[in-house]
């Protein structure tokens, strides 16, 4: 699908369709008022007859409106004008895309980007419209033999901006939006892929392909089990012992900052391509969704793709910690004591608390990069789902400025996170009689004790942890990966690169 921006009055648009907003109760947006005036009150007359109230989600498609060059006008209900916020704006865009796609409008000029969204500028509205449009049109049908497609799918969308001065920011918004949307799609595709296809080797192949595509400043190294043994990554290795698929850690290095002393930002993604729970096996119901336990790695991959596509002036390293947790004769057991790469020992009380065992060795491994910051992304705890539900990602950090940056980026991107405390009192729950720590700390504050466990391996750098157990995928009828938190991390890196959308 093609996107562009232009600046022009609605009556001069010659297109298959013009899209404008209507507020409650039957109140035309400024652009709709212009069209109504040119059409001698045609639109307002329809509203007076009760054709459209302007409630959110309502639509009315008009054909051959008098004195209008475009074939059709699509009126979209936007709710009450004063209540139009970021979330509702994106819902309006989503409804617009679905309606255009369903009605065979192959191209359209959209004036919804001129609606007032409190605290958000033209760049934000155009970029969010692009991201929302791509999200709305996403489908995962690679493995289906019969693929359903619209007879006349939407192919071109033009976003109108109020003045020519805003064309540059609009074009940049499209560029950024497309790169982020492509990263989200890549993450969703990886997450939705079945575990008999998407194993650690598959993740490694995708990482290598990324380096091939962006060979100018991306290199990928894949570390296998033999090298992990030499490095002392015994906790990581233990988790994969029960699987016939080799554990592989893919390290994607992007260099965009020419300064020799520029330190990298490191992103670490938990990549459990299937988590049966191991010896502490999970219930059968819903176990199919444990293919999504690699969504952290999928998100990191998507972000690295965005960074490479936009050629951001940063150094960024993405680590995909690929592994599979299965029961078997070689599987690790409750009661085992593991010596991690850091030298600290861990008593295994539950083999289904495996993500932190993989991550702790990776968090030690990345010390060698002398990072400016490290952010790990993991579907880590069901406790985070209980705490924050399926709408907000859990955030923990040992560095207040980094946490504030991530929260700000999450708000701007519409990919929200909420900070949970890493209070010392929770560390006591990880005490073990037989090792330096246990791998679980009981039910109370389970998301926080998992973060406390990881914090013991991150003392040499600024670190943040994103628990995406509740936000990485949806269940039920809309089942599928969400691609979160690609948007959050993309905004964080755009901010670091100086593109904060305040132009």
UniProtKB/Swiss-Prot annotation:
Organism, as annotated: Klebsiella pneumoniae subsp. pneumoniae (strain ATCC 700721 / MGH 78578)
Reaction(s) the record says it catalyses: Release of an N-terminal amino acid, Xaa-|-Yaa-, in which Xaa is preferably Leu, but may be other amino acids including Pro although not Arg or Lys, and Yaa may be Pro. Amino acid amides and methyl esters are also readily hydrolyzed, but rates on arylamides are exceedingly low; Release of an N-terminal amino acid, preferentially leucine, but not glutamic or aspartic acids
Subcellular location: Cytoplasm
Note accompanying the cofactor annotation: Binds 2 manganese ions per subunit.
Described purpose of this protein according to its UniProt entry: Presumably involved in the processing and regular turnover of intracellular proteins. Catalyzes the removal of unsubstituted N-terminal amino acids from various peptides.
One GO BP annotation of this record: proteolysis
Cofactor(s) of this protein: Mn(2+)
Protein name: Probable cytosol aminopeptidase
SUPFAM superfamilies referenced in this protein's UniProt entry, alphabetically: Macro domain-like, Zn-dependent exopeptidases
UniProt binding sites for Mn(2+) 2: 270, 275, 293, 354
EC supergroup of this enzyme: hydrolase
Record-level Gene Ontology MF annotations: manganese ion binding; metalloaminopeptidase activity
UniProt record similarity statement: Belongs to the peptidase M17 family.
């Amino acid at each position: 699908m093609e996107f562009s921006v232009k600046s022009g009055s609605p009556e001069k648009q010659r297109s298959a369709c013009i899209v404008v907003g209507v507020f409650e109760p039957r109140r035309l947006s400024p652009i709709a008022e212009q069209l109504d005036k040119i059409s001698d009150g045609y639109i307002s007359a329809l509203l007076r007859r009760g054709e459209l109230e302007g409630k959110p989600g309502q639509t009315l498609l008009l054909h051959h409106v008098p004195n209008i060059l475009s074939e059709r006008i699509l009126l979209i209900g936007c709710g009450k004008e004063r209540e139009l916020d970021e979330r509702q704006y994106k819902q309006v865009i989503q409804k617009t895309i679905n309606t255009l796609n369903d009605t065979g409008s192959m191209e359209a000029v959209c004036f919804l980007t001129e609606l007032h969204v409190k605290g958000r500028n033209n760049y934000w509205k155009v970029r969010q419209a692009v991201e929302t449009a791509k999200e709305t049109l996403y489908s995962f049908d690679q493995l289906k033999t019969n693929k359903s497609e619209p007879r006349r799918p939407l192919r071109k969308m033009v976003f109108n901006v109020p003045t020519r001065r805003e064309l540059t920011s609009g074009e940049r918004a499209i560029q950024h939006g497309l790169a982020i949307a492509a990263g989200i799609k890549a993450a969703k595709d990886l997450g939705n892929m079945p575990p008999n296809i998407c194993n650690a080797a598959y993740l490694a192949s995708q990482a290598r392909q990324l380096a091939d595509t962006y060979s100018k400043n991306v290199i990928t190294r894949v570390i296998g089990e033999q090298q992990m043994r030499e490095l002392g990554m015994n906790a990581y290795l233990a988790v994969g012992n029960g699987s016939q698929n080799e554990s592989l850690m893919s390290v994607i290095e992007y260099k965009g900052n020419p300064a020799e002393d520029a330190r990298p930002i490191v992103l670490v993604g938990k990549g459990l391509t299937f988590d049966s729970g191991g010896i502490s096996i999970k219930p059968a119901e819903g176990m199919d969704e444990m293919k999504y336990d690699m969504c952290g790695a999928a998100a990191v991959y998507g972000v690295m793709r965005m960074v490479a596509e936009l050629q951001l002036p940063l150094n960024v390293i993405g680590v995909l910690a690929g592994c599979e947790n299965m029961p078997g004769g070689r599987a690790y057991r409750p009661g085992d004591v593991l010596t991690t790469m850091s030298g600290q020992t861990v008593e295994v009380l539950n083999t289904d608390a495996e993500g932190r065992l993989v991550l702790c060795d990776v968090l030690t491994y990345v010390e060698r990069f002398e990072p400016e910051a490290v952010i790990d992304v993991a579907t880590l705890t069901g406790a985070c789902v209980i705490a924050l539900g399926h709408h907000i990602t859990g955030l923990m950090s040992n560095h207040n400025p980094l946490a504030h940056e991530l929260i700000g980026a999450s708000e701007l991107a519409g990919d929200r996170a909420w900070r949970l405390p890493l209070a010392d009192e929770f560390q006591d729950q990880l005490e073990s009689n037989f090792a330096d720590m246990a791998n679980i700390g009981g039910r109370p504050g389970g998301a926080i004790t998992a973060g406390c466990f990881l914090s013991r391996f991150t003392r040499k750098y600024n670190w943040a942890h994103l628990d995406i157990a509740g936000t990485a995928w949806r269940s039920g009828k809309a089942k599928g990966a969400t691609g979160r938190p690609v948007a959050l991390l993309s905004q964080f890196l755009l901010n670091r690169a100086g593109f904060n959308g305040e132009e």
